[in-house]
């Protein structure tokens, strides 16, 4: 899990030997710039890199003193850092700003691919007893746990092969967020000191996410559990530990046992799309009063009639609409991306034979490139719609500015960045 994310909010003996397809192995993004603003705050992905003013050896010596003051054993520190040098591939990944992003419908195609669904159903059967025990203890449904497992590491097969110590040391030395990386590095050393894993086996992603459900070190220290009773919280090699740790985290994030994540809905003609920001919450009864209705043949889930929900439009007013409840928010705390939370939610349903979206995606409306998003932000601000810094990230300020511009043009104010809006702003120059 990542909370970097985040979590961001993770080697397993996988019984299913089927080789994953390309769609099945695509990593879930932390932030999908073309999606609504997540409900929980996420670290900026465009923080300015901190250029080192000292050598790596000098930085390491200073950090060693800090670690020892925090209770890390000197011999353990020296063993963990033996031969460690900066990993330039980590720096490259940290500073990468992709020009192109996938639209949400393509992301979801990978998240709930037939291969992933089949393998998830096989995992549900293989780990049925373990999952029953986890459900009983933490109250998180097994399909959700298996969905997270599949999204994060393809059921333990793709956990990352980088040294967590080296990656985090590199990021602490010259990454965009050195203080965050340093806190994670200190937490990683504490994991080693607790004896849960050896330094050479502590592998993960370039960002330091670890194990079968991709915990960052601080999240591991607060939520990882030894569910199989072997004395170690082994989220790398024990499916039971990884799944139970995920359940523990979701439980702590407000998971409501027996409740749904959300539901697809239809909106009335003339609906005020400014209400659909993915975070403003109203009782379901209030949404119904505004004309938001269940799809034909469906109904508000039992027990959710008086629940508080937000309205989510992942692809703007032309795409499907969803009311999302507390459990969706809990998934966002695991990984602060609306696309990720929607992927987990739909995959969990698909494992039970449901989770099919009825609304059509606006596939003729491809996402803006990073260069185009920066131009859009600059044009908005030039017209007194404060979009914030032109960084290519469509955050809260930019969406608010987009809504204001859309309202002034008499368009549906869904806050969704489109080529049509960009062209309209260009012609106003």
Residue ranges of predicted features:
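Post-signal peptide N-terminal segment of mature Sec-exported envelope proteins
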Residues: 22-54
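Bacterial signal peptide processing site
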Residues: 17-19
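Mature N-terminal segment immediately following signal peptide/propeptide cleavage
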Residues: 48-83
């Amino acid at each position: 899990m990542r909370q970097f994310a985040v979590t961001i909010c993770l080697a397993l003996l996988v019984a299913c030997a089927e080789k994953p397809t390309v769609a099945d192995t695509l990593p879930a993004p932390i932030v999908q710039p073309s999606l609504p603003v997540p409900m929980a705050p996420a670290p900026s992905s465009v923080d300015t890199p901190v250029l080192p003013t000292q050598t790596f050896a000098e930085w390491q010596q200073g950090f060693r003193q800090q670690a020892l003051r925090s209770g890390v054993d000197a011999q353990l520190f020296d063993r963990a850092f033996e031969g460690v040098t900066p990993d330039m591939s980590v720096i490259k990944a940290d500073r990468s700003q992709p020009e192109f992003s996938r639209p949400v419908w393509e992301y979801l195609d990978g998240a709930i691919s037939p291969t992933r669904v089949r393998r998830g159903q096989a995992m549900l059967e293989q780990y049925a007893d373990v999952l029953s025990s986890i459900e009983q203890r933490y109250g998180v449904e097994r399909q959700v746990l298996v969905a997270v497992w599949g999204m994060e590491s393809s059921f333990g097969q793709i956990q990352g092969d980088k040294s967590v110590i080296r990656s985090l040391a590199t990021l602490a030395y010259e990454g965009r967020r050195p203080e965050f990386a340093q806190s994670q590095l200190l937490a990683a050393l504490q994991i080693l000191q607790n004896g849960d894993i050896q330094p050479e086996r502590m592998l993960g992603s370039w960002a330091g996410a670890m194990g079968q459900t991709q915990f960052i070190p601080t999240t591991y220290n607060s939520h990882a559990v030894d569910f199989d009773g072997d004395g170690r919280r082994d989220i790398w090699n024990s499916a039971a530990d990884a799944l139970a740790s995920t359940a523990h985290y979701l439980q702590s994030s407000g998971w409501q046992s027996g409740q749904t994540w959300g539901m697809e809905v239809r909106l009335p003609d003339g609906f005020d799309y400014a209400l659909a920001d993915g975070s403003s919450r109203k009782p379901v009864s209030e949404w119904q009063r505004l004309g938001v209705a269940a799809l034909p043949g469906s109904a508000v889930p039992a027990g959710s009639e008086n629940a508080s929900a937000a309205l989510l439009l992942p692809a703007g007013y032309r795409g499907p609409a969803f009311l999302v409840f507390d459990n969706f928010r809990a998934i966002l705390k695991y990984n602060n991306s609306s696309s990720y939370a929607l992927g987990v939610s739909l995959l969990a349903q698909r494992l039970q034979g449901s989770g099919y979206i009825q609304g059509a995606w606006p596939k003729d409306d491809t996402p803006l490139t990073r260069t185009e998003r920066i131009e859009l932000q600059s044009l908005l601000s030039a017209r007194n719609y404060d979009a914030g810094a032109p960084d290519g990230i469509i955050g809260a300020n930019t969406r608010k500015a987009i809504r204001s511009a859309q309202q002034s043009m008499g368009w549906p104010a869904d806050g969704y960045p489109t080529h049509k809006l960009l062209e309209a702003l260009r012609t106003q120059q």
